[in-house]
């Protein structure tokens, strides 16, 4: 298939592009490089074994997207592009709504004009809000996300659902991720946060490699086994495989298809710290800090629907997530070259 991947040079996008190329698909990457670096592109080509086309541009540029869809005879779009830092979204809500919501509107408007009706959307478990029961199941009603980031993901889900209702021939997959971590097993591709990492595993990796002094563990008095927050961590390679499978199985299968992509088990902050300590062979310096507003004690996915309908399930453990992250970070302590 001929695939347009928006945000394809970012963390999850780059790993997915490698898997798409390895599976024989033709890939066009559209990225404005606001959260990624151009130097990942030759890595994608080397690991994917095939050349992806790269277009530097913004998803809010509808004319550019229309041109790409026509010129490359695109069959399907995988839509990763968007801003993704929860804390930053609270301080800069308009930017988040403009990029994530308006950007998606421009994208689907271009798709409609070009008669491209297969879309995989990178959604998030944040759309569930605070649920009374765990694990989270796709049939749960969506909640009220705490942040503009989470709200933007939910708004896009609602927009795409309304679009498909009005134009039933569309095939739209809403993939709700839990906590993607890990790196490509080669050690040459991984997460390279700009500035201070917002997520746990890359922060621990930077402590381990000497870029940060200590990890702040927010809250050790939650009603969990060790008092720290529990989340569902999924290896980025499993997540990338999930996109390829969803794209191949759902092409031209009309409807809105919602799937949780998670491991289906919860791991605490200290579980992750201990796994990383084992991977890098040294203790991780950490200290406890007060809980953060809006953080939930524990949640994880029920991913049985993806197993049942897509024949997709995770194959990589928390230890492998830590090992692959350390392999990447120790080989590339400063991330990708500028």
From Swiss-Prot:
The opening ranks of the lineage are: Bacteria, Pseudomonadati, Pseudomonadota, Gammaproteobacteria, Enterobacterales
The organism is Salmonella typhimurium (strain LT2 / SGSC1412 / ATCC 700720)
What keywords are assigned to this protein?
Answer: Carbohydrate metabolism, Galactose metabolism, Isomerase, NAD
Q: What is this protein called?
A: UDP-glucose 4-epimerase
Catalytic residues at 149 (proton acceptor)
Cofactor(s) needed by this chain: NAD(+)
EC no. given is 5.1.3.2
Where is substrate annotated to bind? 124, 149, 179, 199-200, 216-218, 231, 292-295, 299
- Spell out the family assignment given in the record's similarity comment: Belongs to the NAD(P)-dependent epimerase/dehydratase family.
